[in-house]
Amino acid sequence: MYVEYRHEGGFEYFFNKMAKKTVAVMYDVNTKPYALQIINEMQSRGTSILPVYYSDEELVPTEDKCEYAYQMAADADYVLAVGSGTLNDMAKSVSTRRDIPCGVLATAASMDGYCSKGAALMRDGFKVTDMVHTPEDVLIDLDIVRSAPGIMTAAGFGDIIGKYTCLMDWKLAHIVKGEDIHEQAFSLMEQARAECVNAFDGLVKNESGAIAKLMNALITAGTSMAICGNSRPASGSEHHQSHFLEMDFVRRGEKIPLHGLKVAIGTLVSIELYHYLKDQNIKFDGSREVFALIEKMPSAETLKAMLLKMGCPVRFSELGVRRETMEEMLEKAYTVRDRYTILTLIHELGLTKEIAPLILSKYY
């Protein structure tokens, strides 16, 4: 994988690489201006373009949408997504099915899946994660990323603070269940998260250097997952809550809130659950070691204050989640993935109904 930032000459490495090739460029109504710009730049250097355009205001990666791109890319040597989450996942899926490389021109610092081996797609109304090619190229124009709506940057930051709980969940699984931890992947994600959080004041001001730190953390999530061969470094209980809610939005045919916004609130919920165990001194195998780690975690209130400064919602009701859906999420989100997290532990301890009123009062 090669990460290239735009300089005065554009993306010279990428443009030279694509000269005389045929590239399927996937974009939608929101990313059309950036797609047309890079299409013109590539065509001027001898690249043939197969445009794959979606007019959807809110693109959902359903089977028919992916099939359209697959058919349009029949003669392509390469697939380039111009967008963020959905378009990137769809391009990776098409790339894998066609067995050709892919890349992405990132249009927002909104999510952490740019470089992951997983593609989140909708199949029969359910969210599934397919194993796919990782992008060969990630193109970043900080002017484009900074011009994205602030709520998208807030979503990206929400995805990164989710690394507090997913890494803690990994430690929990190691202590309680003996699950192996890939130290390199863990450390890479932990360091990138720290650098991003340390740049928080600059993020609030939308400064280029801080946005670059956020993008680096988002990209590191993908590379750390690739290193260890699974999504543990980037996805835990906070993501399972998000996935559960996302499937409910799809079933109801409603607009899906940005992934990172759901993850951000899920992070607050998970941290609240961790601190509840410690504050109530609830015993379980390995509890002493887990409690020592909880002491090092930021409080939910600290992260909540940061999210509010970023303009991020801090209650699920602000995202249009129904109260009964959140109640169901607290009971069932641990089943979304076969992965041990704080949600699993709370379920095993029989504490879900006991703690639900507190969580609902704070985060609904």
Where are these regions (language model features)?
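C-terminal charged capping/lid subdomain of soluble metabolic enzymes
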Residues: 160, 276-364
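Gly/Ser/Thr-rich loops at beta-strand to alpha-helix junctions
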Residues: 7, 28-35, 84-88, 110, ...
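Generic secondary-structure signature for well-ordered alpha-helical cores
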Residues: 44, 74, 137-150, 158-170, ...
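Active-site segments that bind and position negatively charged phosphate/pyrophosphate groups
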Residues: 186-306
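ATP/NTP phosphate-donor binding region
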Residues: 1-78
